[in-house]
Curated annotation (Swiss-Prot):
Pfam families: Ribosomal_S14. It comes from Francisella philomiragia subsp. philomiragia (strain ATCC 25017 / CCUG 19701 / FSC 153 / O#319-036). It comes from the Bacteria. Binds 16S rRNA, required for the assembly of 30S particles and may also be responsible for determining the conformation of the 16S rRNA at the A site. This is Small ribosomal subunit protein uS14. InterPro entries: Ribosomal_uS14 (IPR001209), Ribosomal_uS14_bac/plastid (IPR023036), Ribosomal_uS14_CS (IPR018271). GO terms for cellular component: cytoplasm; small ribosomal subunit. GO terms for molecular function: rRNA binding; structural constituent of ribosome.
């Protein structure tokens, strides 16, 4: 079980990403636009650097919805491998069954 502070930190990061997503996209569009002047690109890069570090989408880490575990989390289910196996064996995940061949 993850500490509550770690889970709250991830939630805070998700809020920051949502808040600054539009601004980040606009600045990145200016930087990648071939018609932008060097000065415009330079200013956009400076503004992008001044945004909060945690507002970058790559800083957000998927966590298990049950335990808060940060590793081995399946996107489709939002569960870590341990809980996914536990729920699948109990029949709590619809359409999922143990493979046998």
């Amino acid at each position: 079980m993850a500490k509550k502070s770690m889970i709250q930190r991830e939630l805070k990061r998700e809020k920051l990403v949502a808040k600054y997503a539009q601004k980040r996209a606009e600045l990145k569009a200016i930087i990648l636009d071939i018609n932008s002047t060097e000065e415009q690109v330079w200013e956009a890069q400076i503004k992008l650097q001044k945004l909060p570090v945690n507002s970058s989408a790559s800083r957000v880490q998927r966590r298990c919805k049950v335990t808060g575990r940060p590793h081995a989390v399946y996107r489709k289910f939002g569960l870590c491998r341990n809980k996914l196996r536990e729920y699948a064996m109990a029949g709590d995940v619809p359409g999922l069954k143990k493979a046998s061949w």
